[in-house]
Amino acid sequence: MLKKDMNIADYDPELFKAIQNETLRQEEHIELIASENYTSPRVMEAQGSQLTNKYAEGYPGKRYYGGCEYVDVVETLAIERAKELFSATYANVQPHSGSQANSAVYMALLKPGDTVLGMNLAHGGHLTHGSPVNFSGKLYNIIPYGIDESGKIDYDEMERLAVEHKPKMMIGGFSAYSGIVDWAKMREIADKIGAYLFVDMAHVAGLIAAGVYPNPVPHAHVVTSTTHKTLAGPRGGVILSAADDEDLYKKLNSAVFPGGQGGPLMHVIAGKAVAFKEALEPEFKVYQQQVVNNAKAMVEVFLERGYKIVSGGTSNHLMLVDLIGRDLTGKEADAALGSANITVNKNSVPNDPRSPFVTSGVRIGTPAITRRGFKEAESKELTGWICDILDDANNPAVIERVKGQVLALCARFPVYG
């Protein structure tokens, strides 16, 4: 028999300890991985609800199982809020992840072997935009575009490649690009060759929702996103469109279910509904503007300390520190900073001579620290500590000093106060 007082601590202390340790790690480490964030207790409450028990294959009003009247309400709330948030006329909130949302778009719009123009992973793209190790690179003919010497997307090259190869689909979006993307220009190029424009806005969805980064939804045929990252919701995906094309919407729905998934995760969809409501609040706009302000403040200190930033700055939530020419790899920088309770990720940079497992760069993002309450002053102070370690990565005394400073700062700004 199930009882309400059942708990993990009594039943599975080994697992409980791991959960507690992760909670402590999050409180005592400064999180600078650009794709990570802290979701609200309301989102976690939704994910821990009895909605997890309900199978709901299909879509609201068209389910394959009975007893779906209340999960229909939940999913409809999520759909309508997503549409309002991004000025869309269509939303599918069922994808379990951003990658599965992307997979559904490929399935809906393309046939295996079709040509796709996507951003080079080494220049800031994403695995699902055509990497040879990903389904996208294995099933489709991928033509990569990249950035120019200034670190900005090369639209002239993009147009030349599009005209030459005539892809059926062009992909906008990135995982490590700090500039503003000209969605209108991309649509102009796509229209010139009769291609679909698909935008993966996963990294900047929160900024877009808040109006501090251009919205691709009015320009693209279809847009996907994760619901975590800057959006600060549960881990999951969403597909959006404002194309006013019912045939396209049907293809997208069919590609998600039954094409790629079975039953939706209703407890996660409830979490998405909560997160979308939170993103519609005025304070969310203040938060996202601060995310950008903090990123710019960090770049300022890196440049003052003599570090190179790919593209020379940032217009969003992330920056890529280029370590080419320094006696320090991205992997070594990642490890040294981690020893001081500062979490980043090694990342390839343009023209990187090192392997993707070693790299010559570090990717840094500000969504999580801003969620804790950091402003420009704390962001600059933190960047100084990072530079201290990068300047002397093999010095245990420097690492220990910075670790102490990090712990004190974390105590001042708890994740969940």
From Swiss-Prot:
GO terms of biological process kind: glycine biosynthetic process from serine; tetrahydrofolate interconversion
Site positions (Plays an important role in substrate specificity): H228
Residues found modified as N6-(pyridoxal phosphate)lysine: K229
GO molecular function, a single term: glycine hydroxymethyltransferase activity
Cofactor(s) this protein cannot do without: pyridoxal 5'-phosphate
Catalytic reaction annotation: (6R)-5,10-methylene-5,6,7,8-tetrahydrofolate + glycine + H2O = (6S)-5,6,7,8-tetrahydrofolate + L-serine
Annotated compartments: Cytoplasm
Keyword annotations from UniProtKB, A to Z: Amino-acid biosynthesis, Cytoplasm, One-carbon metabolism, Pyridoxal phosphate, Transferase
Binding, (6S)-5,6,7,8-tetrahydrofolate: L121, G125, H126, L127, S355, P356, F357
Enzyme class, spelled out: transferase
Primary location recorded for the protein, binned into one broad class: cytoplasm
Pathway annotation from the record: One-carbon metabolism; tetrahydrofolate interconversion; Amino-acid biosynthesis; glycine biosynthesis; glycine from L-serine: step 1/1
GO cellular component, one term: cytosol
SUPFAM superfamilies: PLP-dependent transferases (SSF53383)
Enzyme Commission code(s) on record: 2.1.2.1
Family statement drawn from the similarity comment of this UniProt entry: Belongs to the SHMT family.
Protein role: Catalyzes the reversible interconversion of serine and glycine with tetrahydrofolate (THF) serving as the one-carbon carrier. This reaction serves as the major source of one-carbon groups required for the biosynthesis of purines, thymidylate, methionine, and other important biomolecules. Also exhibits THF-independent aldolase activity toward beta-hydroxyamino acids, producing glycine and aldehydes, via a retro-aldol mechanism.
Protein name: Serine hydroxymethyltransferase
Organism for this UniProt entry: Shewanella baltica (strain OS185)
